[in-house]
Structures are given as C-alpha cells and as structure tokens.
C-alpha cells in the first residue's frame, strides 16, 4: 500500500521560528489521505463532508472540532460547501510556560479523543482569535512570533472551555438549539428519532429548528442522521464481525435490504464488498527450498 502524502512544515510556516499558521479552507475541497510534520486543530464552520481520520469515518459539519497529531493520517471526501479552518502548530516551537498537555488533546488512548463538538458560543469566541492569528502568522518579526503563541494559547483555552462530547450536550448550561439537536442525533444511531417529541421536550419550534439546521450544515436533519448512521456502519463493518443484518439494526435500519441499498448508493459498493477491503489475507509460510 502506498504511503500517505506527507505535508511539510516549511510549506505552511513562514520561518523555522514561527510556531503557528492558519490555512483557510473556504471551501475545503476533496483532499487525499495525508500525514504531517506538524499538528492541527480543525474547526468546521459550515457545510458538510466525510472526514476519515486514522481509518475512522466522521460525517462532519458546523461545530465539529478535531485535534490532529502529526502522525495521524486523514482525508476529506464527499464535501458539500465545507468551510473550515486549519490551525497548524509545531509543539516543539512552543515556549510559553503553559499546560499545553491539558489544553491540546489527545489526553488518553481513546479512539475518539481528538474529536469534539464546539458550542455556538465557543464558535463565536474562537473566530476573531483565529482571524487575528492568521494575520500575525503572516509576519516574521519577533513580536509577531511571540504573539502567535499567545493567541494559540488563548484559542486553546476557549476551545477547552466550550468543547464537549456530543453525548454529553445535556450537561451544558443553556444548551443552544444546534448543540441540543446534534447531541440527540448522535444518541439515536440505533433508535428511532422522534423530531416532534424532541422539540416538545426542549420547547423548540420544529420548523425553525429545521431551517436553522439546514442553514448551518447544508443538509436536512434526516439526511444528516442517515449519514452518521452510515459512518457508524462503516466502522462496524471494518472493525467487527457482526453480521450485516445485525449492523443494519445497530445503525437504525430495520430492513437489512434497505440498508444495503442505501449503503451501496452512498459508498459505491455493497456492505460486503466494503468489509472485504479491510480483511487482510493470511500470510502463508514460505515453502522450504528443495
């Protein structure tokens, strides 16, 4: 298998002293699998797409945040008006006496340690910091180099304060509409999602919520739910031995034939063929020479 493309620090950072850079993806196009000589913070502002991080697929949209380590490999596929910022940084160039290890995950061995959601309030606070960071990182004087690190620290603290796991959105004070619906959808991967009941419990207007969701993500709520269910199915197909019919049920599809049809249409191959791509052939012992 061909090694992923390597992105080098010198192509993104203006000097060997500059610790941070910002690359605006307005929009983010399809990008082949790659790895880096640097770390990244990815913040999604609008649209949607498929982000495959270390072979784990995520259907990403407004408010998603990823902490990418240099050795990670990832790609972007099936993008639709996807707008995001990449905040690039080299840990070895950070000199402030800050608790970076508590601010910039991964904090542990969990597979999803690098994936978080960012509240609407957090997005509003982060955006001007990133804009200033982008301006300062284009300069090479010593004051700008120091200021970029200060701004990165400020951004890291804002993200630490306002990031959350999708399954824990109910613990947030004054949960925003988008945060609440995203959390509810993430918890409905294998169960029926009752939109009317959700709106009634949270005192939301269904029509307004649907309009807000489409405006921020570029797709309907039902389409997004189907997409994250398919992403979950891909994870199970490549990482478990469950039968395809069981995987369909675990991903909210009561009819396995319908699941196969939807999966084939979206992935361009059947669930069985998709699974076969990740099954390694056994290595046969070499025959002794006569």
Curated annotation (Swiss-Prot):
Record's subcellular location: Cytoplasm
GO CC annotation terms, alphabetical: cytoplasm
Keyword Hydrolase: no
Record GO terms (molecular function): DNA-binding transcription factor activity; sequence-specific DNA binding
Any GO BP: rhamnose metabolic process
Main location: cytoplasm
Domain HTH araC/xylS-type: 179-277
Annotated keywords: Activator, Cytoplasm, DNA-binding, Repeat, Rhamnose metabolism, Transcription, Transcription regulation
Pfam family, one: HTH_18
Residue(s) at site: Interaction with sigma-70: 246
Top-level taxon of origin: Bacteria
Record-given protein name: HTH-type transcriptional activator RhaR
Source organism (scientific name): Yersinia pseudotuberculosis serotype O:1b (strain IP 31758)
Gene for this chain: rhaR
């Amino acid at each position: 298998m061909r090694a992923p493309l390597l992105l080098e620090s010198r192509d993104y950072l203006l000097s060997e002293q500059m610790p941070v850079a910002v690359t605006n993806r307005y929009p983010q196009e399809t990008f082949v699998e790659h790895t880096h000589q640097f770390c990244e913070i990815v913040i999604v502002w609008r649209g949607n797409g498929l982000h495959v991080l270390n072979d784990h697929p995520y259907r990403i949209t407004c408010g998603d945040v990823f902490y990418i380590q240099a050795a990670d490999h990832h790609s972007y596929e099936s993008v639709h008006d996807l707008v995001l910022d990449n905040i690039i940084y080299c840990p070895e160039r950070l000199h402030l006496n800050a608790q970076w290890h508590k601010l910039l995950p991964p904090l542990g061995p969990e597979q999803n340690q690098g994936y978080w959601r960012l509240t609407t309030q957090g997005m509003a606070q982060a955006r001007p910091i990133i804009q200033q960071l982008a301006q300062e990182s284009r300069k090479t004087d010593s004051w700008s180099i120091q200021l970029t690190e200060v701004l990165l620290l400020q951004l890291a603290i804002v993200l630490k304060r306002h990031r959350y796991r999708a399954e824990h959105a109910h613990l947030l004070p004054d949960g925003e509409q988008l945060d609440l619906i995203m959390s509810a959808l993430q918890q409905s991967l294998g169960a029926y999602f009752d939109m009317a009941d959700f709106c009634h419990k949270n005192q939301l207007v269904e029509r307004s919520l649907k309009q807000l969701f489409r405006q921020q993500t570029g797709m309907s709520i039902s389409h997004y739910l189907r997409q994250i269910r398919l992403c979950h199915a891909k994870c199970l197909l490549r990482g478990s031995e469950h039968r395809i019919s069981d995987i369909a049920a675990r991903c909210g599809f009561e009819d396995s034939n319908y699941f196969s049809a939807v999966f084939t249409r979206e992935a361009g191959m059947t669930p069985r063929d998709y699974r076969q791509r990740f099954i390694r052939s056994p290595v046969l012992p070499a025959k002794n020479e006569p």
